[in-house]
Amino acid sequence: MTDLPRAVVLLSGGLDSATCLAIARDMGLETYALSVAYGQRHAAELTASRRVAHALGAREHRVASVSLGEFGGSALTDPAIAVPEDAAPGGIPVTYVPARNTVMLSMALAWAEVLGARHIFVGVNAVDYSGYPDCRPAFIQAFETMANLATKAGVEGHPTTIHAPLIDLSKADIIRRGVALGVDYGLTVSCYQADDDGRACGRCDACRLRREGFAAAGIADPTRYQAR
């Protein structure tokens, strides 16, 4: 029996990364899910990531830790900075975590090299997104170039491909794709300030994009919201 090619999938526990995991599985790849505890205030997403990894048949799921909260600079890691509850007026919002995707992709790259995996999946999106600089196609292309210059696998002729299959999709299109692939979005948590039970605030930018996406897709929103 031929071994399936391997892929490392960054899995936050949210809607987009769950869809990425389903896409990688649908491509016939053996999936290894990597979640990162980086000091985020919405730690319920890590619990969600375990549910999603199990439901979508990841070969292995690991939760790695890195203390981005030590540096602060983001509403997601610094409790002194409030999470905005209105749509961002433009520019890079305070929910941007400095260098987060660079750090996480580097961790995924390290595990991929150990596994002999030539594919890394990340759920960044440049359409319905919040203005983050590390969610753009130029960033993904630049990271892939760096990855193949900086690793033993790359210089020995075994290049790594960084897949960002959602990058040009609307949130509604992402949801439709995931539903077609059997993703149970009721298992996921997107909210920036979800409570310990994973219930969403319904007011932050992540909640707004998620709610609007389900509405535009014409699909019932399975999100559990906190009582107001």
UniProtKB/Swiss-Prot annotation:
Main EC class the enzyme belongs to: ligase
Binding site for Zn(2+): 191, 201, 204, 207
Chemical reaction(s) catalysed: 7-carboxy-7-deazaguanine + NH4(+) + ATP = 7-cyano-7-deazaguanine + ADP + phosphate + H2O + H(+)
Source superkingdom: Bacteria
Cofactor note: Binds 1 zinc ion per subunit.
Annotated InterPro entries: QueC, Rossmann-like_a/b/a_fold
EC number(s) on file: 6.3.4.20
Nucleotide-binding recorded as keyword: yes
Stored CDD domains: QueC-like
Keywords: ATP-binding, Ligase, Metal-binding, Nucleotide-binding, Queuosine biosynthesis, Zinc
GO BP: queuosine biosynthetic process
Cofactor(s) of this protein: Zn(2+)
Task of the protein: Catalyzes the ATP-dependent conversion of 7-carboxy-7-deazaguanine (CDG) to 7-cyano-7-deazaguanine (preQ(0)).
Family: Belongs to the QueC family.
This protein's name: 7-cyano-7-deazaguanine synthase
Organism: Azoarcus sp. (strain BH72)
